[in-house]
Structure formats: C-alpha cells, structure tokens
Amino acid sequence: MKKVFMISIGLFLIGCKGSQERSIVINAPINEVWAVFSDLGGHEHFTALDSASLSPSGEVAKGATWYVTQGKNFGKSEVTVVEPMKKIETKLIETSWPVTKWSETHTYSGDSESTEVSWKVDFTGKGVGNLFFPFFNAYLGSDIKKSLKNLKKIIEG
C-alpha cells in the first residue's frame, strides 16, 4: 500500500506524459486542405473549441500567437514552425488546463487529388489532472479523430 501511495504522489508531482496522433485522408488537393487547416483562427469551426484566434491575424507565420478557449479554460501557444503545405508546429506558452507542456504538430502530404493530414499532440499533465490522466489521454485521441472527420466533411462538402 505504501508503494502505491508513493507512486501516486510521484505522478502527482512529476506529471504524466502523453502523446496522441491521428491522421485522415481528405479527397481534395493539398492547397485546399492547407487553406482551411492552417487557418488556426478558424479551428473553432471543426473542433470542440469555443473560440480560436491567431495574432497577428491572417496567414499563419512563425512567432504568431494562437489563443483558444473552451468553457472557462484557455490556452495560448506560439507557432514555432511553418513549412507551407507541409507542417505547422506550436508550443504552449500559458494555459488554465491541467497541463504543463503541450505541443502540436500538423503535417500535410498529398497531391492534386487527395491530402493526408496528421495531427499530433504531445503533453504533460499537471497536479490533480494526473489523477485522470488515462481518461484525458483517451479523450484527446477521440477528440482529434472527431475534429479531423469534421474537417474532412467541411472540405469535401
């Protein structure tokens, strides 16, 4: 019993690391998919987010700030990598969610017929959130999958 208690305390203090990645093929040229998915300020249209914005607004650029909200929670990330038609990476700056680290990688590959989009999130839990870590990890994977299906529906019509 003492061992279980010590392990629980350790996880609570250190944090749990997780990673979720999902992909989908969208029947549209890569430039059409890029135009929608790279618009980080428009992610509220196909995700569970209540709002999303990019500063400065417009085309995504390295150094831009991506601000999202969901309910009472918010997240503020910096865009760290932009390779047009290939990749976008972001890294968490500040959040009210129970995580200490959060980074996203969106990758694109395709041609004039179809595009594969991959969405990967790496994160580390914080505090009480670690107690629910397995559930949050599973939920995140499901949420990414649902968001990609919504994206596909929006683009394919």
Predicted regions and their residues:
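Hydrophobic ligand-binding cavity/cleft-lining segments
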Residues: 14-55, 153
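Sec-dependent N-terminal signal peptides
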Residues: 4-13
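Stable alpha-helical elements in mature extracytoplasmic
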Residues: 29, 36, 88, 140, ...
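Beta-strand/loop substructures that line and gate deep hydrophobic ligand-binding cavities in soluble
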Residues: 93-142, 146, 151-153
